[in-house]
Every structure is written in C-alpha cells, then in structure tokens.
C-alpha cells in the first residue's frame, strides 16, 4: 500500500493569494502610520497665527471755546412815537455840510434846546392799499425838541432834507409837503420850519417802502423871519 506525505502537497492558489494580500495590507498600514507620525513631528512647535492687536482710537484735539460776544449797549434816550407806527429812520446831527448849514445853526444838547436833525424823527407804517392792490404807507415826521425855556420858537427846525433814494409814488403826494429834489434828497414841508411837537404827515403808494432818514435840518432862531 502506498502512502503520500501531507507536507509534500503544495498549497492551493487561492490560499497563497490571500496570504499575499494580508502581507501587502499590513505593509500599507505601516506606511500610512509612518507618514502620519512624520507629519505630526513637522507640525510640532508651530504656533497658530495671531491677529494683529487693534489700533487705538484717535483722540480728538481740544477745541478752544469761542470768545463770548459782549452785550449790545443800548442808548438811554427813548423815542416818543405814535402807537402802531414803526421807526424807519432818525436823522443825525447836521453841521455846515450837506447843503444845510449857515446862519442860525446851533449844535446844542437836547436838554438845552434845539439839536437840529437829531430832533427830527420819521415814523412809517402801513396804510390802506389802493383798489388795484398797490401797498400804501403813511409817514409822520415829528419835531421832538423839548425846548430849553425859550418856548416853541427856540425849537423851530427848518430846511429838513430827507434821504429817500429814487422816491416815487403811484398816488399823488403834495409837493408842498414832500417832494424829491434829486437822487436821495427830498425836501419836507417845502423847507418851512417845524415847531416843537409839530408833525407833518403824508401818504404814498408803491410796491415797496422807502427807507427814509433825515440828512440835514437847521435850527432857526426866529421862525417868523422870511
């Protein structure tokens, strides 16, 4: 009887292929582990990037306070004016210039008597407009001289000239009361004197009011003289 030895029998092909597959898988896993270890060693000691510190906010420059505006100084002199009227212009003290000086001119304090143009006040207000709608204005010119003991004659003021621009009126203004002689020069009361407290009034119509102010006024010693 013939007996065969088991050790001499070669392994089947499927078993050999499986064995080689196991060996290759083990080698592949070993290579992956080594690569991971090397990558971990390369990253060791590196710190993550830190963002830059925030910039400090700019400090605004100090602003010096604005100087305080001094209060306006009001004149102690009060004006006597009709109720409901607006002061448009008050004359200035006139001397020998402007075509109004000459004999009889006296520049004095108001308490002592006539002060010339400084005693003439012009009040202007609105009046009833024309039927066509053109605005109307009323003007009152008053001699405010208080007198110095010599009576109304001491406060007589004549030759009153008014700054009036290119004054004109749609309605007629009595030229004996107020008329324009030239540009910015109008004559009041035909040049005749106003006594203390006297008022001359007139009315004019235009699309806008004129700014009126006294330019020249003359104190007269004897208002009855021609």
UniProtKB/Swiss-Prot annotation:
Outcome after substituting residue 83 to P: In mil2-2; defective in early anther development
Tissue: Expressed in roots, and anthers and ovules during meiosis.
Signal peptide annotation: 1-35
Keywords associated with the record: Differentiation, Signal
Observed effect of gene inactivation: Male-sterile phenotype due to the absence of tapetal cells in the developing anthers.
GO biological process terms held by the UniProt record: anther wall tapetum cell fate specification; cell fate determination; microsporogenesis
InterPro entries reported for this sequence: TPD1
Coiled coil: none
Subunit structure: Interacts with MSP1.
Free-text function comment from the UniProt entry: Involved in cell specification during anther development. Required for the differentiation of primary parietal cells into secondary parietal cells in anthers. May serve as an extracellular ligand for the MSP1 receptor kinase to limit sporocyte number in ovules.
Protein name listed in UniProt: TPD1 protein homolog 1A
Species for this entry: Oryza sativa subsp. japonica
Organism lineage string: Eukaryota, Viridiplantae, Streptophyta, Embryophyta, Tracheophyta
Gene responsible for this protein: TDL1A
